[in-house]
């Protein structure tokens, strides 16, 4: 749905004469990949991934959550896998890249049917090497606090709770990658508008994200 809405917005702005950059911000990174890799190693089948990548990978994710109820140690295993992925361990990176490539083939098949194209597929993984800059910037500006080994930005006085920036094991989160993505896009495209088409369930996330960018001194954030 968000893809179709985003494409409609693109057509409107394009017709008005704007130079529009269409970005598909793939959710191709995060702890869910630790869980899917874990599930694949325990119960996976290569041919299933090749034949039906989306259905199969979602099935692995569901299977993981069913099994973790009976075997809680799987959670630790998945976290360790994602940490290895973030650190560039070859086996984890190879599996992650394969999952991404097979999924993208299927996505592109559907996009072609819908007549939708993108100028960029830079998703969450694209920003993995850019995040340390912003974690350091948050620390230098006195915005980052330590809490039980994790790092947070306290937004309580804005009525936005606490934003988790890095977990206690050092792994990053969606909001960390979104901060890096926003600044990268501004520096790369110098946009007049940066329009996100997302579900309403992400309202708090984006309110926190905008507030953090403003506190960092990025006046264009709102």
State what each model feature region is.
Residues 1-222:
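NTP-dependent nucleotidyl-transfer catalytic core
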């Amino acid at each position: 749905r968000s893809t179709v809405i985003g494409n409609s917005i693109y057509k409107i702005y394009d017709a008005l004469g704007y130079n529009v950059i269409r970005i598909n911000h793939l959710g191709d990174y995060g702890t869910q990949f630790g869980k899917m890799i874990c599930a694949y190693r325990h119960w996976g089948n290569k041919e299933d991934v090749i034949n039906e990548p989306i259905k199969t990978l979602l099935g692995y994710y569901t299977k993981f959550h069913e099994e973790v109820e009976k075997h809680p140690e799987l959670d630790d295993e998945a976290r360790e896998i994602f940490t290895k992925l973030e650190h560039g361990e070859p086996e984890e990176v190879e599996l992650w890249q394969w999952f991404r490539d097979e999924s993208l083939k299927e996505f592109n098949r559907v996009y072609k049917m819908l007549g939708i194209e993108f100028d960029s597929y830079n998703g969450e993984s694209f920003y993995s090497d850019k995040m340390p800059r912003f974690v350091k910037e948050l620390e230098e500006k006195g915005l980052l606090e330590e809490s039980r080994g994790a790092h947070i930005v306290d937004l309580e006085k804005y009525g936005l709770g606490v934003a988790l920036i890095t977990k206690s094991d050092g792994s990053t989160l969606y909001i960390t990658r979104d901060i890096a993505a926003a600044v990268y896009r501004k520096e790369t495209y110098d946009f007049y508008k940066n329009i996100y088409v997302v579900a309403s369930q992400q309202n708090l996330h984006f309110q926190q994200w905008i507030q953090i960018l403003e506190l960092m001194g990025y006046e264009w954030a709102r």
